[in-house]
Amino acid sequence: MGCRFCASTQGGRVRNLEAGEIAAEIYGVMRDTGERVSHVVLMGIGEPLDNFDNVMDFLEIVSCADGINIGMRNFSLSTCGLVPMIDKLAEKKLQLTLSVSLHAPENTMRSSMMPVNNAYPVEQLIDACRRYQQTTGRRISFEYSMVRGVNDSDQTAAMLAKLIRGMGAHVNLIPINPVDGSPYSASEIGRAHV
């Protein structure tokens, strides 16, 4: 999706994984560790909602009683904010946690870091999150990478609080890691503990 502070996007997209390939990762971890996997986070290279059908099939495979039987509340699905797909996911009424990579509370700032914001501006994204929450009854988790001098001011924090007020959301403040070739650096240590 081309997020400019993310090392995962530097290799470019090759293809989406099939449902069985995603499930094979879980089974591989269980085989290698000898332990049952109880929680799954769909995040990292790729956009889960851009691979919707395979992700839904994967969830069915590993959550069913004949599979690993992981409870749906033990899944977290991350998205950069594909608004139509958030609405489509809401229709499924799954009890997973939706983690939204927000990273900025206003459009100019978010677009400079995340090109997807040009297609789905902050206001549309937050409206979709509110619809998701109303439909599923699930709290949204907002991922917010702290970038020095870009999105870590007190004013930006106040804008973020105003933007999501009344949602009962969780905000995960994440100091970014250094990425070769990126103009971004992590906020000072204390900024992520506002």
What residues fall within each predicted segment?
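Canonical Radical SAM [4Fe-4S] cluster-binding loop centered on the CxxxCxxC motif
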Residues: M1-G20
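Conserved AdoMet/S-adenosylmethionine-binding subsite of the radical SAM
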Residues: A23-H39, G44-G190
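Conserved small/polar residues in nucleotide/adenosyl-binding loops
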Residues: A192-V194
